[in-house]
């Protein structure tokens, strides 16, 4: 990782510092992938549960209440080890609100350490598995690296594809082409 404050935006701030500390500890203990799996399991629970999101976001709960509630949830979900201790620590330190950002930053650090580039791809409708593999292969050729594909379905695109990798973006959607034609026709008047 780059030093002297040149980390990416996800590794900046409180979330980035916590994620980096967790990554370094997990790396030292040979548990990087186990921690990632457990954080992903917690993140899935977070996205599915309105009650958990309220607990995480609300300052009305004390650190002790958050720690106890999160501890019970982790036990029920089978999330243990370093990831569970980390989540409990964020609750005890009143940083639970930043946990979703910490999880994103941890994922980014894991990808970076493995030389994997995240590509956000938006399409109008769900492509077949073969098309998804073709997209990955094309992006791998361009990036000269393994790709972690984050696929989003966006019917407003009408057709085509929008790809974002790092700071680069290619918009080959039908919506953008139609808007360009519309703009050209207005200028021709």
Curated annotation (Swiss-Prot):
Instruction: Kindly state which keywords UniProt assigns to this record, in alphabetical order.
Output: ATP synthesis, Cell inner membrane, Cell membrane, CF(1), Hydrogen ion transport, Ion transport, Membrane, Transport
From the UniProt record, report the name of the gene that encodes this protein. atpH
Is-annotated flag, keyword S-adenosyl-L-methionine? no
Location in the cell reads: Cell inner membrane
Q: Which cysteine pairs are joined by S-S bonds?
A: none
Give the record's subunit note: F-type ATPases have 2 components, F(1) - the catalytic core - and F(0) - the membrane proton channel. F(1) has five subunits: alpha(3), beta(3), gamma(1), delta(1), epsilon(1). F(0) has three main subunits: a(1), b(2) and c(10-14). The alpha and beta chains form an alternating ring which encloses part of the gamma chain. F(1) is attached to F(0) by a central stalk formed by the gamma and epsilon chains, while a peripheral stalk is formed by the delta and b chains.
Naturally occurring in which organism (per UniProt): Methylorubrum extorquens (strain CM4 / NCIMB 13688) (Methylobacterium extorquens)
Protein name, please? Answer: ATP synthase subunit delta
Q: What does this protein do?
A: F(1)F(0) ATP synthase produces ATP from ADP in the presence of a proton or sodium gradient. F-type ATPases consist of two structural domains, F(1) containing the extramembraneous catalytic core and F(0) containing the membrane proton channel, linked together by a central stalk and a peripheral stalk. During catalysis, ATP synthesis in the catalytic domain of F(1) is coupled via a rotary mechanism of the central stalk subunits to proton translocation.
Extract the signal peptide range: none
Molecular functions (GO terms): proton-transporting ATP synthase activity, rotational mechanism
User: Which Pfam family name is an example for this entry?
Assistant: OSCP
PANTHER family from the UniProt entry: ATP SYNTHASE DELTA CHAIN (PTHR11910)
Query: May I have one GO cellular component term?
Result: plasma membrane
Return the similarity comment: Belongs to the ATPase delta chain family.
């Amino acid at each position: 990782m780059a030093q002297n404050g040149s980390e990416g935006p996800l590794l900046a701030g409180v979330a980035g510092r916590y994620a980096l500390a967790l990554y370094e500890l997990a790396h030292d203990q040979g548990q990087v992938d186990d921690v990632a799996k457990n954080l992903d399991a917690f993140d899935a629970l977070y996205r599915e549960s309105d009650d958990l999101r309220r607990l995480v976001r609300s300052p009305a709960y004390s650190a002790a209440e958050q720690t106890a509630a999160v501890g019970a949830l982790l036990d029920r979900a089978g999330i243990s080890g370093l990831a569970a201790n980390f989540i409990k620590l964020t609750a005890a330190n009143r940083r639970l609100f930043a946990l979703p950002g910490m999880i994103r930053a941890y994922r980014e650090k894991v990808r970076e350490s493995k030389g994997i580039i995240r590509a956000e791809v938006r399409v109008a409708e769900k492509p077949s598995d073969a098309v998804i593999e073709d997209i990955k292969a094309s992006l791998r050729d361009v990036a000269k690296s393994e790709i972690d594909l984050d696929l989003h379905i966006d019917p407003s695109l009408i057709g085509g594809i929008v790809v974002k990798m790092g700071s680069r973006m290619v918009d080959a959607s039908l919506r953008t082409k139609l808007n360009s034609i519309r703009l050209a026709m207005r200028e021709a008047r």
